[in-house]
Amino acid sequence: MSATTELQFQHVHKAFGTTLAVRDVSFRIASRSFGVVIGPSGCGKSTLLSLAAGLDEPSSGYVFLGGREVRGIRDDVALLFQNYNLFPWMTAQANVAFGLTMRRMSRRAASAQALNYLNDVGLGACAPRIPDELSGGMKQRVALARALALKPSILLMDEPFAALDYQTRKIMQRYLLATRARTGATILLVTHDLAEALTLADRLIMLSGTPGTVQEVIDIKAPHPRDLSHPVLAGLMRKLEAHLEAEAASSEFTTEERNRIMADG
């Protein structure tokens, strides 16, 4: 793992053709800390993850990881999408082991380590099953096990727990916090779940608008586990809710626009 895993965006713009996705985005996530990005749909949250992962490049500005500019995919970065990306013909255990064998670990050792990570996410008994035999929430946990098995310096996560029930989501949140504490990885997570954001974040990045811009960066000093009924956290929750409600109101169609769309449809 890198000596420093600080992630930094400096005046990043990203356009797709003539459409600007994010505009002048700057923020920093310190080494070994947990950053969470929230904002309305369409504000470029997933775009930021792709830029941090090296899957795409900024139109202007810079992204740094560990003091080095991100240019292309790095071995010490793991990205967990909403859609799992599991190999459908492989068992859960083989899916987790695959990346380890690509790093020249023996198949036997990779298989054993994969089973350990599946046990960590509560799916050891599902190791011999293929993805079609798993629920959506189970697939998400297999994908999480696969990402963590690589022991990344930075873990980038896009709505990783969206398909999980409430109880399993809380278990996975605690597991993720424990893993961060144990490995020292830096984590950047995108979520629409405000309770999840306040439960996990050391630093909260609030995006607004389309194209997405940084409205505010909020540091949360509360220790874990957190009681969201605490006055400070409850106040933050109200602030975040008001922010998203204002964003939703500003993006609503006018009556004239809605009528025109209906007429064209």
How does the language model describe each region?
Residues 199-206:
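Conserved catalytic segment of ABC-fold P-loop ATPases
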Residues 209-239:
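Conserved beta-strand-loop-alpha-helix hinge in the C-terminal portion
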Residues 65, 206-207:
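Short hydrophobic beta-strand elements within the C-terminal catalytic ATPase subdomain
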Residues 195:
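Residues within helix-turn-helix
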Residues 163-166, 235-264:
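Extended, non-globular alpha-helical segments
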Residues 59, 125, 152, 208, ...:
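A general structural signal marking secondary-structure boundaries and capping sites
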Residues 2-184, 188-192, 200:
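ABC family nucleotide-binding domain
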Residues 1-13, 253-265:
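ABC-family P-loop ATPase nucleotide-binding domain
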